From Swiss-Prot:
The gene is trhO. InterPro entries: Rhodanese-like_dom, Rhodanese-like_dom_sf, TrhO, TRHO_N. It comes from Caulobacter vibrioides (strain NA1000 / CB15N). One of its GO terms (biological process) is tRNA modification. The active site is at 183 (cysteine persulfide intermediate). Belongs to the TrhO family. This is tRNA uridine(34) hydroxylase.
Length: 315
């Protein structure tokens, strides 16, 4: 039976002094054996933590006492083994990097519940934009969604400004944009709606809870999602009902590998995949192969490979 609760959370709110929050939060996590990463910035908090159920509840109670966090609702999963090596509480300029320093992320667009999402994106007047990175989109996407082909979220503002010019050239600048955006768990699409509003787009919507809530709530026969959804944990990808998908993670380049690419002679488990095989030299491949051998050996013994006792990090 799974014994570790994994809680993914974020909240855009105003913290006047994130540094004053950092120390007590890190100390609490350390005292309770909670591990993971939490990012703090003047715009809020973001991260994922894991630990015993009671310990996670205590940390969440502490976070909910912070300004603007009273109704914080994390996404919860369960793991048989501790998925993190240590606790990190970091101060950042942004909790998710967009690179627009004057943006107010609390001035976001309109939430759309998963149950209402299909109707919205089926409207021919609505332009649907995927705010995730290109490698995530390749794993799965909503039918008809626009793929910005970004390498990072920070690329999104420049892409949007260029894309908007091309749209206005076709439709005319007087035609109002009506945009629906989505991401994995909600944080990127929420911040991107604030960005679009700052750019003067009035009708902007985002999927509440992101793709994960949609896949959890919408039955597959009614779904407009195609493929799987990449996730940033050991599952790599999930499908409807949040069932673990068929993608695996390449330990060489950290990119998802499809079932088709897993069948390629260029895929070597723990070493390389078709995307990075020719970019890695023999020395790199040999080191990766040795590390993978050690990982498999430790798994067979039922022990952690490295880092299980790393200290809490505050930076």
């Amino acid at each position: 039976m799974a014994s570790y609760r994994v809680a993914a959370l974020y909240r855009f709110t105003r913290f006047e002094d994130p540094a004053a929050i950092q120390g007590p939060l890190a100390a609490l996590c350390c005292s309770l054996g909670v591990k993971g990463t939490l990012l703090l910035a003047r715009e809020g908090i973001n991260g994922t933590i894991a630990g015993e159920d009671a310990a996670i509840e205590a940390v969440l109670a502490h976070i909910r006492a912070l300004p603007g966090c009273a109704d914080l609702t994390p996404k919860t999963a369960w793991a048989e083994r501790m998925p993190f090596y240590r606790m990190k509480v970091r101060l950042k300029k942004e909790i998710v990097t967009l690179g627009e320093p004057d943006l107010d992320p609390t001035d976001a667009g309109t939430y759309v519940e998963p149950a209402d999402w299909n109707a919205l994106i089926s409207d021919p007047d609505v332009l649907v934009i995927d705010t995730r990175n290109a490698y995530e989109v390749a794993v799965g996407r909503f039918e008809g969604a626009i793929d910005p082909q970004t390498a990072s979220f920070a690329d999104f503002p420049a892409w949007f400004r260029d894309w908007r010019k091309s749209v206005e050239a076709q439709r005319g600048p007087e035609a109002p944009l009506k945009v629906a955006m989505y991401c994995t768990g909600g944080i990127r699409c929420e911040k991107s709606t604030a960005f679009l509003k700052a750019e003067g787009v009035e009708q902007v919507f985002h999927l509440k809870g992101g793709v994960l809530d949609y896949l959890e709530q919408i039955p597959q026969p009614e779904s407009l999602w195609r493929g799987e959804c990449f996730v940033f944990d050991e599952r790599v990808s999930v499908g409807h009902g949040l069932v673990k998908g068929d993608h695996v993670l390449c330990r060489g380049c950290r990119m998802p590998v499809s079932p088709q690419d897993q069948a390629s002679p260029l895929y070597v488990e723990g070493v390389a995949c078709p995307a990075c095989h020719d970019q890695r030299n023999e020395e790199q491949k040999a080191r990766a192969a040795e590390r993978h051998r050690q990982v498999l050996h430790c798994e067979a013994l039922g022990v952690d490979h490295v880092g299980a006792t790393l200290p809490t990090k505050i930076d």
